[in-house]
C-alpha cells in the first residue's frame, strides 16, 4: 500500500508573532552584536525543528501576509483596524526568519492582496483533493475550519512548542459544531480581533435560518 504524501503548512506571521512574545520577557538578552533582536528567530527555529521531526513532511510551505491591505480591506475598510501595530523589534526579524527558511530549503510565499490564511486554505484544499495528508501549524483558531479526515490543524497553546491538534472530531468536541460550520458561527458572532460586528439580535429574530440572512 502506497503511503500518503505529507504536506506541512505553517502560518508564518502568526507563528512569528507568538515566537516573539514567547520570549518577550528576555528581549534584551536575545540580541546580536549589531543590536538585532533575535528572540523570534530563535523560537521560530525551535518550533520548526520540533514540527519537522514530528511530521516528517514530503513538502513544506510557510505562508506570510503580504501587507495590511487585502481584498477584505477593500470591501470593509475597518477590517482588523483595531489591532496594535506590530512591534518594530519583531518586524526587523521577519527578513531573517525568511532567510532561515531559505537556508533550510523550506519554501515561503506571500501574495499581494491576500493573507497567509488564504494561501494555507487554498493549498490545504488542493492537497486534500489530491489525497495528501496535511498538517497546518498556526496560532489562529479560525483555521480549524480547514480540518478534514486528511487535514489536521495544530494550534499553539503556550509559546510555540506546545500544540493542540484539531481534527473534525476534536472541533466537534470543543465547539459542538463541524469544521464547515465555523464560518457561519464566526459570521453570526462577529470577531473583535478582526474588528467585524456580530449579526444583531433583531436580524436573528427576523430570520429563521442562516440561509435566510
What residues fall within each predicted segment?
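Extended two-metal-dependent nuclease catalytic cores across DNA- and RNA-processing enzymes
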Residues: 2-4, 28-31, 81-205, 211
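Domain-level signal for Mg2+-assisted phosphodiester chemistry and nucleotide/NA-binding surfaces
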Residues: 1-107, 158
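Short, cationic motifs built from Arg/Lys/His that form the positively charged side of catalytic pockets
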Residues: 18, 207-208
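Conserved protein kinase catalytic core
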Residues: 17, 71, 144-146, 213
Amino acid at each position: 500500500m502506497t503511503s500518503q504524501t505529507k504536506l506541512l503548512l505553517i502560518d508564518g506571521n502568526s507563528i512569528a508573532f507568538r515566537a516573539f512574545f514567547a520570549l518577550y520577557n528576555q528581549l534584551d538578552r536575545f540580541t546580536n552584536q549589531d543590536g538585532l533582536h533575535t528572540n523570534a528567530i530563535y523560537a521560530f527555529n525551535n518550533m520548526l525543528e520540533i514540527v519537522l521531526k514530528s511530521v516528517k513532511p514530503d513538502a513544506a510551505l510557510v505562508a506570510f501576509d503580504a501587507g495590511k491591505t487585502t481584498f477584505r480591506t477593500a470591501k470593509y475598510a475597518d477590517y482588523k483596524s483595531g489591532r496594535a501595530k506590530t512591534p518594530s523589534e519583531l518586524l526587523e526579524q521577519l527578513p531573517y526568519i525568511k532567510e532561515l527558511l531559505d537556508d533550510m530549503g523550506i519554501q515561503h510565499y506571500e501574495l499581494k492582496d491576500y493573507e497567509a490564511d488564504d494561501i494555507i486554505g487554498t493549498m490545504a484544499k488542493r492537497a486534500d483533493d489530491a489525497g495528501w495528508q496535511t498538517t497546518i501549524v498556526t496560532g489562529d483558531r479560525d483555521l480549524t475550519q480547514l480540518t478534514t479526515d486528511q487535514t489536521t490543524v495544530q494550534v499553539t497553546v503556550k509559546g510555540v512548542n506546545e500544540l493542540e491538534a484539531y481534527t473534525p472530531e476534536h472541533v466537534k468536541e470543543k465547539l459542538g459544531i463541524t469544521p464547515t460550520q465555523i464560518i457561519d458561527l464566526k459570521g453570526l458572532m462577529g470577531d473583535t480581533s478582526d474588528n467585524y460586528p456580530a449579526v444583531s439580535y433583531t436580524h436573528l429574530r427576523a430570520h429563521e435560518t442562516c440561509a435566510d440572512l
